[in-house]
Amino acid sequence: MKEEKVTKNILDWLESNGWKIICYDFPQSGTGVLLHLNNDKRTEKNKGGIIPDIIAVKNDIGIFFENKDRFYKSDFDKLNEIKTESNYSDSLVQLLNGLNVKAIYYGIGIPQLEKDIEKSKLHLEKIDFLISTNTEKEVIIHYDSDGIFSNA
């Protein structure tokens, strides 16, 4: 399953569960929003910028997705860095301005392939949620550290 299908399935699932989509992106879509490194971390204008695959909000919660077509450890590392070092906090605050978001959670969306799910589960300490999807558009929550999908 391609990253585009993973993202579209998750977008549909989020919207059907009351999440407001703020931005989304998948390969060749051209729809994403570039988040810049905070000024104190930036060396060049767009260097180090990232484009999240999905940012959505519900109530006072924001969620930040990185979606892939399979397991990539580097995405877990990237999300952990974004989460713990707040390197993109200025751009996120600006993007979510006026939405009363009190917390942002970071996670991964992947296809429902057992080998990739098992590899992903070895890195759960770096993310807040792990979600998979399949060709039937089902979405499975494998990990949700703070119950954001059941409580929001």
Predicted regions, residues:
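Nuclease catalytic cores
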Residues: M1-W19, C23-F26
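Catalytic cores of nucleic-acid endonucleases
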Residues: N17-G18, G62, N67-E138
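Active-site metal-binding core of divalent-cation-utilizing nuclease and nuclease-like domains
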Residues: I22-I61
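Charged phosphate-binding loop/patch that engages nucleotide di/tri-phosphates or the phosphate backbone
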Residues: E136-A152
